[in-house]
Amino acid sequence: MTAVTDPITRPASGEMSLARPAGVLHDLTAIAGRALRAVPRDPAAVMPPVFIALFFFIVNIATLKRLTGNHPGFSYTAFEMATAILLGVTGVSRAPALVLDVQSHYLDRLLLTPVRRTAILVGHMAADVAVAAVLTAPILVLGVILGVRFHGGVLGVAAFILLAALWSLAFAGFGYAIALKTGNPAAVNSAFLLFFPFLFLTSSYVPRSQLAGWLSTVAGFNPVTYLLGGLRSLVLGSGWQWGQLGQALAAIAIVGVISMTMCFAALRGRVKRGAQ
C-alpha cells in the first residue's frame, strides 16, 4: 500500500513575501506620508491662512507701529510677528481631508485593516506639524526683512517655530474631533472660528499691561496670552526668558490635552459605529 502525502508548497526562488510590514512606526509613516503627499494637490487648504497672516502683519504694523514709536527698546514689528504667526498656523490641519475620507468610506475601509487606530490620527498630526513649521517661513522671512532679530540666534528661531508648530498641533485636535464626529466639511471649516475669541481677548495688538478692566481679567485666563508671551520673549528683551517659555508650553499642553481627549474620543466613537 502506497501512502499518499500532500506536497508542501514552497515559495519559488526569488519570490517576495507579501506580508504586511508590522509596527506602529510603519503605520505612522504610511499615514503621514499619504497626508503630506496630498498637501501640494490641495494648496487652498494651506495658502489662505498664510496670506491672511502676512496681510494683517503688514497692515497692523503700518497702522499701529507709530503709536509705540516713542518707546525705546520696543519693536512693534517683533511684537506683532507673534500674532501673525498664530494667524498663519492655527487651524491648519488635514482634518478637511479626513472628512473626505469619511464621506468616501475610505476611513471605514482603513479601519478594517490591521492598521493601528491611533496611528490614523497621530499620522495626520505628524504631517500637520511639518506643514505648520513650513508655513512659518514666509512670516519669519518678512519679519527679518523688517528688522526683527532673534536673541537666541538659530536656536531662538528653532524655538519660535517649535512653539508655533506645537500650538498648531494642539488646536488641530478640535478640527479632527469635529471631522470624526460629524463628517461635515462645513463644520470642520468653521472650527477656526473657535480661535477668534482667544485671539482678540488677549494681548494680540497691545501689551498686556495696556489692557484694562474685564479685558485684562479675561486675558489672564486666556492660554493664547501666555503663548504670545513665550513667542515674544524670543524676539523682545534679551536672553532666554525661561519663565515665559515655560508658561507658553504649559498653555499649549492644556489646550492640547483638551483637544486630544476630544478627538481620540471621537475616533473611538467612529470605530464603534463602524463595528455595529
Q: Which role fits each region the language model picked out?
A:
Residues 55, 59-60, 75-146, 175-178, ...:
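Hydrophobic alpha-helical transmembrane segments of multi-pass membrane transport proteins
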Residues 60-62, 179-221, 225:
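Transmembrane helix segments
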Residues 33-52, 240-242, 246:
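Membrane-interface helix starts
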Residues 38, 61, 65-66, 100, ...:
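Transmembrane helix-loop junction
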Residues 38, 151, 202-258:
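Membrane-interfacial helix-loop-helix junctions in multi-pass membrane proteins
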Residues 117-192, 241-264:
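Alpha-helical transmembrane segments and their short interhelical loops
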